[in-house]
Amino acid sequence: MTKFTTEEVRSKFITYFKTNNHTHVPASSLIPQNDPSLMFVNSGMVQFKNVFTGQEKRPYNKAVTSQKSLRAGGKHNDLENVGYTARHHTFFEMLGNFSFGDYFKEQAIYYAWNLLTKKFELPKNKLYVTIYHTDDEAASYWKKIAGFGDDRIIRIKTNDNFWSMGDTGPCGPCSEIFYDHGENIYGGLPGTKDEDGDRFIEILNMVFMQYEQVDKDTRIELPQKSIDTGMGLERMTAILQHVNNNYDIDLFQKIIDYTENIVKVKVKGEAKFSYRVIADHLRASSFLIADGVIPSNEGRGYVLRRIMRRSMRHAHMLGSKEPLMYKLLPKLVDLMGNIYPELKRSESFISNILEQEEIRFKTTLERGLKLLSEETETLTKGDKLSGEIAFKLYDTYGFPLDLTKDILKNYDISVDHQGFKEQMLAQKERARKSWLGSGEYKTNQLWFDIKEQYGSTEFLGYTLNEAECKIIVLIKDNNLVNNIQETDTQFLLISNQTPFYGESGGQMGDNGTIFAKDSEVEVIDTLKYLGSIIVHKCILKKGKIHVGENANFSIDVKYRQNLRIHHSATHILHAVLHEVLGKHVTQKGSLVAPTYLRFDISYSKAVTNEEITLIEDKVNEIIRANHEVNTTLMATEDAVKQGAMALFGEKYDSEVRVVKMGNNSLELCGGTHVRRLGDIGCFKITNESAIAAGIRRIEAVCGEFVIKLMREKENLLKSVESSLKTNKNELITKVNNILERNKGLEKELEKVHLAHLDLSIDQINKEAEEIKGVKLIYQYIENLNNKVLRQAAENLTKKVEDLIVVYIVGNSDKLSITVAVSKAITDKFNAVNIAKELSLFLGGTGGGGQASLAQAGGHDIGKLNKIHEKLYSLLTVL
């Protein structure tokens, strides 16, 4: 049996099916598109789900893929097992061949058998197959093609060998191929009590989609029968490299060897498992980030964080004091970047996210491990850690439950899952009660009732600025009313149709006016509820307004135009960010206001001044080109095929609105836009900042607001010139001279303060108070910088061997504490401990420093009169 590399196995599989007229389809993102039932793509068939159900047509009827997949929980895939067993992974590659109404059972079995025995040269006597117990057709084909007898064809009655997409829809029997690793490895054949052992390993699974489940009692033959085949790349490679553990294949070994060279710990004993965890989780983390997932505390982001923090804990176990994962990324890119180019494109971004997350977690990891160690001191083998402590580790120290379980597994200690769930539910209940008490619950139910009775609001604003509409709902103080007649009353109004845009997609809602027969209403905002109810937030200016009457709805055209300008600019900005910062940049949020725009992106470092200038230049160049802006309604599938930008994880209707701006931007968008890009006028970035880990925010203005901004800056410059009695050509020189002079004055002032605080040995002996055999100098000072205090306190403790100096400085409503201790007595009196106790007494959170010099903070000025008493009791105890 020839030995193949991982890359050769993948390539040979794809080439084999391409030779047999299958279209090679690239791997889809790990984030399922328009499939809310899945968090991640977990098999090769996911991207073809709509093809199998007949909802989508492709230009081919046979396909082959190498699909990146991810599983981080569920049956046989608990995260805590990854790295400790031979075949558990979070990230893996699923090789697959598919038929959509072309070949079926016999040809699928032939392809699989020929691939394994001819192309991969597996010995026939090492192979067994399973079929669904009633699938005589599959049994006959296995006998015909492989020459197997009944002893090698195992009939399985359970659902393991019958696949379905859900309660209804396509379904069918399966046939699996198993490889025998030999008698020296524990395990039994499928269907036996020892089937979970490692001897007989499933290497290929074929699903014969031949039925449609109409309801729970009715199953009919499908007119178009299909094939879904999956083969795990890592499992197959292990067999072809003559090893029984997936982590021993070349791909993982190269990552492990690379890691070993960095951490300098031998791959043996318990360390071996940590190396495997890191290798597996490096792949999962890197591919998730490449596909737009950012570590967070919910949804996909939390799964990523769980995986990353588990790997970081294992890096910690190997003695890695510095961030490790990002240092391993170049090796992964070298190994997998050619087949998955998104890794290469996003390498810098992935590296930054990995490093930042590890730095952040290291600050709480040590404290969390300390708490866990303290809480398990009295626990022995077989005991349970309380759910309360597990939840505290999760809530306070950022330990996912998987991580706590993973740590305790080494000591045969489990976690009280029920107690953890109760703590989690209690927290949610507290939040729920807060929500119920806020009045939001009642309002929420109201919108559901309105939608059920009246349906959606028709939006007319793409083409009309005013229209006659019928008032169908009036709401005041969360209650339905028939009329509003008190002037200056605030209320909500819903009509059957409206030209007013309800806030959504980042664009703020419209303002304007409503005129009815006897009334005038000011619309101060427009909202959107449940995705399709447009709600006008109103103030009655005069008259009386009734449910059922018609009225003239007129938007503020100038306000809308400014919204259009800034919204269209966000699309151009998005396209340019891809060009300047990289394709891996994804939109994380936006706000389109009439006076500015805000755009949040996944990007792990500050955008440089040079990049900001380049972005501005490119956006303005596109604006000046004055391309036409076109909007089209089309099927979501067609829009995505044309390259329209869509947000990852968003669920879109079957028909979407596509906004095209020349050849520069194509996005799915329901907002309002300019007719030509020249209408934007000009574009200027006003601010760039970090708002969360891996998320940057860009703020900008357009059109007349750029001119306003420039005028404000020009007026400010003139004001500064006037105050400093200079001109703009000499302004920088003048300011630098002033700064230099101020620096000199500050140094002189520091010297004066130090001289004032300095004491001779005789003065120290005279002024110091003696407590428990040591001298204490305590002083409260107003408005003095900490640098001077540190130096002054340290100078005094160097003069006398038994001195403690405590300075407290009041600056506004904050207190700064400086504690210095003569080095000769630090074994008994520790400056850090004294500073910490004083800080806690004054409402602070503790301090830091060294045994001889420490600083801390506080804010409870009312306790200053008791500080001397606190110091006395503290030093007496010490």
Curated annotation (Swiss-Prot):
GO annotation, cellular component aspect: cytosol
A GO term, aspect molecular function: alanine-tRNA ligase activity
SMART domains cross-referenced by the UniProt entry: tRNA_SAD
Leading EC class: ligase
Domain remark text: Consists of three domains; the N-terminal catalytic domain, the editing domain and the C-terminal C-Ala domain. The editing domain removes incorrectly charged amino acids, while the C-Ala domain, along with tRNA(Ala), serves as a bridge to cooperatively bring together the editing and aminoacylation centers thus stimulating deacylation of misacylated tRNAs.
Family: Belongs to the class-II aminoacyl-tRNA synthetase family.
Name of the protein this chain belongs to: Alanine--tRNA ligase
Organism listed in the record: Rickettsia canadensis (strain McKiel)
Lineage, top ranks: Bacteria, Pseudomonadati, Pseudomonadota, Alphaproteobacteria, Rickettsiales
Gene this chain is encoded by: alaS
